[in-house]
Amino acid sequence: MKKLYTIVSLMLSSLSIMATDFKDCSMAIKSNISTNIEKSNTTVFINRNTFSINGLKYDNTDLGNVELTNLQVINGYSDGTMVYATSEPQYITIGGEKVAANFRGEVRKSKFRGILNLTVNGSNYIAMIGDKADELGQLPNAGFENFHDASETSDTKEPNGWHSFKTCAGSLSGTAGKANNTFIESKEKHSGTNCVKVQSDILSVLGFIKQPANGTMTTGRLYAGSTTANNTANNSTMDFAATDKDGNGDPFYPIFTTKPDAMTVWVKFKGNVKDYPNATVNAILANDKVQDPEKDDYKKNVIARATNATIESKNFAWQELNIPFEYANKNTPKGMLVTISTNAKAGKASSDKKNLDVIYVDDIAMIYNSSLKSAQYKNTNLSFADNKAAIEIEGKANEADFSIASDGEGAYISKVLKTNEGETGKSTLYITITSNDLQKSNCFEVAITDKTATGIFNIKSDSNATSSTLYNLAGQQVSNSYKGIIIKNGKKYINK
C-alpha cells in the first residue's frame, strides 16, 4: 500500500470568532487506494480563518499534524452559523510531498462538522469530521424522515427544514394558515420510513367564499399578502436576517454554500385540474434575500436556478426528476430556496374536495460533477486511457502549460508536477478534479518525457505509454524485438 500522507486542517472561524477547540469530533477517513475506512475521534482547532487538526491516522499509520490558513468565511446568518471553505485548492507540504487540499466545514450551535479532501501523488483521501459531515452539500432532512409540529397550537406536521402555510406570514396569514398542506406519509414512501405528502386545500374566505389553494411547501417561509393569487406578495421567501424560528427551533432558511450541477427528486403526483395539469419544483441558490416568484429587488442575489414546472401525473407512479442548475454568476451561495407546489400556476388548485391535488415527495439529492471535460498541453489535446496519458515535449514541463476543464460547475482542479526519482528527463503531472461538495475526486496522471534529455524526438500524446514503453532514437515507439539502440525510461540500451 502506498505511504499515506494526510492532512486535515483547514478553515474555520471568522475574524469575529475566538480561538476554539472542538473536542471528541467523530472522524472517518477513506481513500481511493483502499476499501478501509479509518474511524476515530479527534480534536480540531479553529483560530479566525485557520483550521488545524493533530495526530491523524490511517491504517495504523501516523499522519501527523496539519494546518490550513486563509480560508473563505461565509457568515451573516441570524442563528450565528459560520461556514469556512477553501475557495481553490491549497498546496501544502506533508512529509516532503506537495499535497493538494480542499476543505469545507461549519460551526453551528457550537458544534463543528467538515470535510477535508486531499491528494498526494495521485492518491486521494477524504476525512469526514463531525456528526453528519456527509450531509454537507445536501438539504437537511432530504429523505423526509423527520417531522415536527408546525406550531404549539397546531397538530399539523411539517418536515424538518420545510414549511407550509401553517407557519406562513403576511397580512392574510390568518386565512392562508387554515390550509392543511403537509402530512407524514409512511405507506406511499419511495424509500426509508417516511416521505411527505403535499396536498391542495379549499379555504373559506369571509365565511362563504370557497377558494382553492395550491398545496405548497418550501425551505424558506411562505407569505400570504394578497387576494390575487399571482401577486408577488404571495410567495416563499428566504431571508438570512430573519430571526423567527419554526416549530423545530430552526430558522426559515437552509444553510447551503455549495454549487450543485443538478437536483434529483422523487415525486408521485396526481393533478385534478384538466387545464392546469402540472406540478412544480423550483430551486434558487442565493447569497442574500430572495423570493419565489422572484421580485426585481432581489434578483441580483440569485446565483443559480433549477426549475421543472411541467411535472405530469404519469399514472400516479413514482418518478425521478433530474433538474439541472443554470448559473447566472460565480458568486458563493449562502442558502437554497426550494419551493414545491401541487400546481405550476398560482391559485389553480382543484375545487373538488373529494379530488384534491396531491404530490408525494421523497429523496431529494444534489448532484456534483467531477469528470474530466478536456485536457491540453499547450495546443496538444491529451487522450486518457484508464485515467493515464503520456506525452513527449521539448524541455521541462510547467504546471501552467496544462489546461484542464471539468464538467462540474464548482469543481476544484489541482495540478502537481513531480520529477520522477532516478529517471532522467521523466516527470509526472498529477491532476485531481474534486466535486464541489468534496465527497468525490477523479485522479489523472500524465507521464512526461523531456526528449531533449533522453534523445527522443517527435511530440505526441500517447494514452497507452507505460514505464516499459520502448523508443528508437527517432522517437518512434518500437517492440521488444527491435534491434539497435533503444530508449527505455529515459535511458539508452543496445538491443541485440
Per-range role (PLM):
Residues A19-S31, E38-N41, L63-Y77, K111-L139, ...:
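Edge beta-strand at a domain terminus
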Residues D59-T61, F269-P277, K289-D292:
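Extended, low-complexity, turn-rich repeat/linker tracts enriched in Gly/Pro/Ser/Thr and Asp/Glu
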Residues D79-E135, T218-N234:
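Beta-sheet ligand-binding and adhesion/scaffold domains
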Residues N369-A453:
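Beta-rich interaction/scaffold domains
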Residues N369-S374, T449-A474:
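Residue-level detector of functionally pivotal "anchor" positions at catalytic/ligand-binding pockets or at interdomain
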Residues M1-D24:
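Bacterial Sec-dependent N-terminal signal peptides
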Residues N36-K98:
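Central antiparallel beta-sheet cores of small beta-barrel/beta-sandwich binding domains
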Residues A127-P260, P277-N287, Q291-N322, E326-Y327, ...:
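Aromatic (Trp/Tyr/Phe) and Gly/Pro-enriched flexible surface segments
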